[in-house]
Curated annotation (Swiss-Prot):
ATP binds at K345. Residues 591-697 form the tRNA-binding domain. Its main location: cytoplasm. Residues 557-577 are annotated as: Disordered. The gene is metG. Keywords: Aminoacyl-tRNA synthetase, ATP-binding, Cytoplasm, Ligase, Metal-binding, Nucleotide-binding, Protein biosynthesis, RNA-binding, tRNA-binding, Zinc. Belongs to the class-I aminoacyl-tRNA synthetase family. MetG type 1 subfamily. It catalyses: tRNA(Met) + L-methionine + ATP = L-methionyl-tRNA(Met) + AMP + diphosphate. It comes from Methylibium petroleiphilum (strain ATCC BAA-1232 / LMG 22953 / PM1). This is Methionine--tRNA ligase. It is found in: Cytoplasm.
Length: 697
């Protein structure tokens, strides 16, 4: 029975261009959407720009534009990326559209009627010059623990201390430099801690989608959610109520009946999924409310692991208690790395999607490579340049494309491009084997196990190439009286090539369209693998795909950033300050030997709930136990990035009681004093062969 699907990807924040992580997610979702359409299902695939919030308002002001114009300019640059990588959204909208304003306010009113909205007074820093309340990211000052300057309003990146913004010494607004003052403000909260919400979410997160029968969430996601639900013996932890309001001036959607109050961007952003679909339906003359109320509709979201909390807790609770359908599935993926490392422009490991296209690299090389690394689990995808070249050249060109190129020419020259339906038993056995794989490959696409689907397709291609090598059409073409046999062998190859193209079409849509033209067939669906072409005429073969020139990879990776005048060798000779700050006063060797620096291996790492700066690290320092250290490196490293790495720790620093637990040391990292001009945070890592516990002397 045909399905009707509503599919989205996470909304990109409208303050910059797409990065490679966006493109990876769009490719993952686009493959799934194309597969569903090849199965005969109706799919509405929509996206939008996340257009609200203080960062956009401030960036627009600096650019001399209104927020609306700033967002519109960003949106105007989306098309080259989407078209270039064959991402087939049905609609692209903005969370600042009228549909989102209406839907967000309607959702709020429904939650308020349901008794899940309350208000309370909170204290915040206020910039008297800008006349606005300051989020933590716009407040800096001296750390109350170690005295380090220019630290953010919630934690110190030097000593790792966590504190309230009110504890900062000499605080200042990063917007104006003014000293902020404390002001109270009434804020609106969504009562996520309500027993009603908790009971619903426990059922929803553990449940299965009514139509597919599959779990709504992946096992890894469900395990993480269980951690968020957990409370200690004193009842601490668990889900907290959610502050959904911000004070004017703010670029966003006004809260009904609350002058000067706006929805926090994370309330209206996911509602943007619905708004984009409504915008599309209105343009198509379709009934949005009827579609969303239809029990046959399936709602599916593709997101990155960093926004799991919002999409698996806030979002379904908001929908359920405002009377709307909840998602059938939230599919979570990992991040993308380069050669096992987090991408970094300064280290020459950043991939610009637009540069990829501009230097002439085939978009479907990347689609294939990413698909060959993706599965249904929450795992990172690693882009390795050498592996990229080998997979594309060996699999796509060497195994798949070559099947057609080895057979089509003989059919055109000797048989006027006509295939024969009279195939011997050997050919029928080969083709029946390819046809029998259809359901398995379809199941793998459905489960987002793209890597397995492509491995199975390439294993089939290997069997076809073995058939070609065994029957040697190039030799048959030279032998008298072998025309019928030559036509059979070449027809078998083209039939097999067509079946493989069906299986690869969700990943390679542009190439598949070329193949459909070459084969003179209508757009192919998965069901078409159940039949053969038979006595059918094809067009003359034209080369379908070039091999990757490894030199293109050198051009792809952005070179390290050019040194600024302040840090260039010439400037250094003129007395530049190294690292942006003067050297500390001279100490004696006796002073230095008081510090016990040891090599440590990071055996585990996790985010610290309630902090945007800290990671909780578990360190092996060679003591026979693991130490816990809170380190302010979250801005540069995800937990998965650092697990297994060696680094340097101050081992004899007195344990420090912090809000989140006891920190037993300090991990050393390097950064420039002027982080705006010179962003980056770098762990100190020893050369290979090091073991935990070695002393740094």
């Amino acid at each position: 029975m045909p399905r009707q699907l509503f599919v989205t990807t996470a909304l990109p924040y409208a303050n910059g261009h797409f990065h490679i992580g966006h493109i990876m997610e769009y490719i993952q979702a686009d493959i799934w959407v194309r597969f569903q359409r090849m199965q005969g299902h109706a799919v509405h695939f929509v996206g939008a720009d996340d257009a609200h919030g203080a960062p956009i308002m401030i960036a627009a002001e600096k650019a001399g534009k209104t927020p609306q114009q700033f967002v519109a300019d960003i949106a105007a640059g989306r098309k080259p990326y989407l078209d270039g990588f064959h991402i087939a959204f049905d609609n692209w909208h903005s969370t600042d559209g009228p549909e989102n304003h209406q839907l967000a306010q309607d959702t709020y009113r429904a939650l308020r009627r349901n008794g899940l909205i309350f208000t309370r007074e909170i204290e915040q820093f206020f910039d008297p010059v800008k006349a606005m309340f300051l989020p933590d990211r716009y407040i800096k000052g001296e750390c109350p623990k170690c005295g380090a300057k220019d630290q953010y309003g919630d934690s110190c990146e030097v000593c790792g201390a966590v504190y309230a913004p009110t504890e900062l010494k000499n605080p200042y607004s990063t917007l104006t430099g003014a000293t902020p003052v404390m002001k109270t403000s009434e804020h609106h909260f969504f009562q996520l801690s309500s027993p009603r919400c908790l009971d619903f979410l426990k059922d929803w997160t553990h449940g299965s989608a009514p139509i597919s029968g599959q779990p709504r969430l992946q096992a890894e996601v469900l395990n993480k959610i269980k951690e968020w639900f957990a409370t200690d013996e004193q009842g601490h932890g668990g889900l907290a109520d959610w502050d959904i309001s911000r004070d004017a001036p703010y670029f966003g959607i006004e809260i009904p009946d609350a002058p000067g109050k706006y929805f926090y961007v994370w309330l209206d952003a996911p509602i943007g999924y619905l708004a984009s679909l409504k915008n599309y339906f209105d343009k198509q003359g379709l009934d949005f409310e009827a579609f969303m109320a239809d029990p046959k509709t399936e709602q599916v979201h593709f997101i990155g692991k960093d926004i799991t909390y919002f999409h698996t807790l806030f979002w379904p609770a908001m929908l359920h208690f405002s009377g709307r359908r909840t998602p059938d599935h939230v599919f979570v993926h990992g991040f993308i790395t380069v050669s096992g490392e987090k991408m970094s422009k300064s280290r020459g490991t950043g991939i610009s999607p637009l540069r990829y296209l501009e230097i002439g690299m085939n978009a479907e090389w990347l689609r294939y490579y990413i698909a060959a690394k993706l599965n249904g689990r929450v795992e990172d995808v690693d882009f390795n340049p050498d592996d990229f070249v080998a997979r594309v050249n060996s699999d796509l060109v060497g195994k798949y494309i070559n099947i057609a190129s080895r057979a089509a020419g003989f059919l055109s020259k000797r048989f006027d491009g006509r295939l024969t339906a009279e195939l011997p038993a050997e050919s029928r056995t080969l083709l029946e084997g390819l046809q029998a794989a259809r359901d398995d490959i379809a199941r793998l696409y459905e489960d987002r196990e793209y890597a397995k689907a492509l491995r199975e397709a390439m294993a089939l291609a290997d069997r076809v190439n073995e058939y070609v090598d065994a029957n040697k059409p190039w030799e048959l073409a030279k032998q008298a009286g072998q025309d019928a046999r030559l036509q059979q062998v070449c027809s078998t190859c083209i039939e097999a090539f067509r079946l493989l193209t069906i299986y690869l079409k969700p990943v390679l849509p542009a190439l598949a369209a070329q193949v459909e033209g070459f084969l003179k067939v209508e757009p192919m669906r998965f069901a078409d693998a159940g039949r053969l072409l038979g006595a059918h005429a094809i067009s003359e073969y034209k080369h379908l795909m070039q091999r990757v020139d490894p030199k293109l990879l050198d051009a792809l990776f952005e070179p390290p950033a050019e040194p600024s005048p302040q840090t260039s060798p010439a400037a250094a000779g003129a007395g530049a300050v190294p690292g942006g700050e003067a050297l500390a006063p001279t100490i004696t060797i006796d002073d230095f030997t008081k510090i016990d620096l040891r090599l440590a291996q990071i055996v585990d790492a996790a985010l610290v709930e309630g902090s945007t700066k800290l990671l909780r690290l578990s360190l092996d320092v060679g003591e026979g136990r693991h130490r816990t250290v809170f380190s302010g490196i979250q801005s540069a490293f995800k937990p998965a990035d650092v697990i297994g790495k060696f680094t340097v720790v101050v081992a004899n620093l007195a344990p420090r009681k912090m809000k989140f637990g006891l920190s037993e040391g300090m991990v050393l990292a390097a950064s420039h004093a002027d982080e705006k001009t010179h962003p980056g945070l770098y762990l100190l890592e020893p050369t290979p062969g090091a073991v935990p516990g070695l002393r740094v002397r």
